Amino acid sequence: THRYLQEHSKIPLLVGANLEDGGCGIATDGTQYGKQMQIAATGDTEDAYRLGKVSCSEGAAVGCNWAFAPVVDIDRNWRNPITNVRTYGDDPDRVLACGVNYIKAAKEENVLVAIKHFPGDGCDEVDQHILTSVNSLSCEEWDATYGKIYSGLIQAGAQTVMVGHIAQPAYQKAYNPDFPDKLVPATLSPELLKGLLRKKLGFNGLIVTDSTCMVGFSCAMEREKAVPYAIEAGCDMFLFNKDLDEDYR
């Protein structure tokens, strides 16, 4: 269906899918290559290239041209319900190397990547489907871990970044000393998107939200306020809607 629509559309379609562990992210008969942690466990970062090759070639074959991958979070807390085996583990250097290799394969298949979930998941035990999660690292700790990863992947040519419903209080306070003492997700934080991602890291590509149907997005403020605020904060594109007419208004 995706391929048919892609081939017959007057305007080229942007078709995205979670191509994290194989073509199975979009094709019912696609290969399930392996979770990212399984890839990391081999000790060979070239396996991440092979994962990207299988995922993106099969995705492209059915009309997908945008991979919501790779996951570049760090498995700092094994109880985290979102990341865990979806990550390349707890070593930032390995996460970076695997991410670079996935991007290399995706480019060869003419598939865009969305590195996720900025500013970095894997620190706490919160499910963003239910609440806003927190990246609790100091600015210095973040720079040496998640910052190193995002900087490297941006330099490697990542075209888009998927922003999670994740607060990063240290940098939010650093960019705005008057920032309120409450959890505000990155999707609603110009401090993190315009300040940290755009200005400090120099990212000039597209910023897309994680699913805005998650409570982690709307628990900070009512959705009718959150939608325009996310745009003002720096989000270029929304993933999913709840009521299209209401969101558009």
Located regions from the model:
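Structural motif
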Residues: 16, 69-70, 116-117
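N-terminal hydrophobic targeting/anchoring segments and the immediately downstream early-domain regions
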Residues: 1-36
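Hydrophobic beta-strand scaffold residues
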Residues: 13-15, 66, 113, 207
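Short, conserved phosphate-binding/catalytic loop or strand-edge motifs used
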Residues: 72-82
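Alpha-helical scaffold segments that flank or form the walls of functional sites
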Residues: 43-64, 146, 226, 230
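Second-shell residues forming the walls of enzyme active-site clefts
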Residues: 1-7, 23-25, 90-249
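Divalent metal-dependent hydrolysis catalytic cores, especially in the metallo-beta-lactamase
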Residues: 65-73, 234-238
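A charged helix-plus-loop insertion that forms the helical arch/lid used to bind
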Residues: 32-43, 87-89
